[in-house]
């Protein structure tokens, strides 16, 4: 059914539109780092050390990207945004845990998780689950590439 609490937008996790998701995710450019203050803080610290010593993992942005795909009906086996969460407080479900794991992998290794096989998340012959995993992997990689402080930079 979805969460009864979803910030200033009423109606549960499924109430968000793609425009609202974009507003929540923040702009991603050189002047407005991922819509929150940590991006600027990470840049400051990395510049102070002259190299990348801290990176961020854009879990929320990956979730926002996946939610937009769910709205468009492009995530196999997933019908509602609320399937990404396990409760009204925004804790992630198994689906969200998989997305977060791929996002962490991409941020740590600086490599795309697309095509990564995780046996415990795959069932032999389950093409929907495999296609769903591919959607999660792609969202994770797009999120990590889009957030400048998620990848190692050479310009400090």
Where are the regions a protein language model picked out?
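Short acidic/His/Gly/Ser-rich catalytic and metal-binding motifs that mark active-site loops
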Residues: 3-9, 66-69, 76, 112-113
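A contiguous binding-surface segment within folded domains or other stable secondary-structure elements
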Residues: 55-77
């Amino acid at each position: 059914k979805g969460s009864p609490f979803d910030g200033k937008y009423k109606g549960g996790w499924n109430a968000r539109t793609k425009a609202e998701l974009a507003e929540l995710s923040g702009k991603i450019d050189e002047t407005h780092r991922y819509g929150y203050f940590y991006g600027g803080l990470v840049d400051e610290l990395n510049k102070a050390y002259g190299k990348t010593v801290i990176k961020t993992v854009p879990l929320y942005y990956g979730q926002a990207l996946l939610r937009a795909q769910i709205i468009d009906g492009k995530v196999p086996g997933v019908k509602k945004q609320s399937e990404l969460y396990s409760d009204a407080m925004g804790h992630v479900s198994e689906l969200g845990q998989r997305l977060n794991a791929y996002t962490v992998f991409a941020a740590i290794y600086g490599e795309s998780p697309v095509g990564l096989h995780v046996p415990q998340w795959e069932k032999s012959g389950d093409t929907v689950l495999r296609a769903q995993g591919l959607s999660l992997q792609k969202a994770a990689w797009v999120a990590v590439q889009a957030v400048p402080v998620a990848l190692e930079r050479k310009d400090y």
